[in-house]
Amino acid sequence: MPINPDAVGAKSDPTRSSWTSKDALLYAVGVGAGQSPLDELQYTTENSADIDQKVLPTMAVVLGFGGGFDKIGDFNPAMLVHGEQSIELHREIPVSGEIETVGEITGIYDKGKGAVVVSESRSTLVSDGEPLFTKTMSAFIRGEGGWGGDSGPALEWEQPDRDPDETVTYTTRPEQALIYRLSGDRNPLHADPTFAAMGGFDRPILHGLCTYGFTGRGLLHALCGGDSSKFKGMYGRFSSPVFPGEDLTVNIWRTADGEAVYQTQGGDGRVVLDKGTCSYTA
């Protein structure tokens, strides 16, 4: 087993990254904003009358890569599957800016047939040195378990026994993955039919983080009235691939003041993003 379970606590070197107004607009279109051209203009345009450009909160996932996976030892990247993703917004993301990011390995768990590695990335805005957002992701690495280590904490999540308080449905476009990849994730699994076939798919699949972005838009509008300053964070567990062109339905239950849980379903009703939570200013 080439990965090192003792790498917990290892940190990456600080890295800097920047983005522009154009990057924010492209990300928004990449997660479906603008399909109704008169809606969401604050996220899809920079020059509409009496509208100030804003940044979708989930854009945090494509900014600042400092995961620290280079600290855990050797493994086959093809065996890595993105399992969970969370973001915590400390304030609104500006339309353009530069951040410094440090990643830390916060957990390595033995799942028998594989290992789960948890990484936290903290990003600060270079202009003032203050925190902007924190991201946590977990990855399942097949074939790297079996050393007798801790299996990790169990996630406590319960779907309320009632109809959703809010339901939002979006349609992904056939070329959605080709648009989303322009925000940085050029994995050929999402564009190259030959590569997708090697993974057992008959055509390229949508990025999991694109599904995450669509879901974040749904939460933003249903819970925050479209106001990005009220969106504080979200978590979700990837449970099934999505194909471009599918509908995505976000079922949302309010559970407390400023808190909600959700599930996102594909067009056939299967759950594609599970055990979701969202925090916001009510």
Predicted ranges, named:
Residues 7, 18, 40-42, 54-61, ...:
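Residue-level preference for alpha-helix termini and adjacent loops
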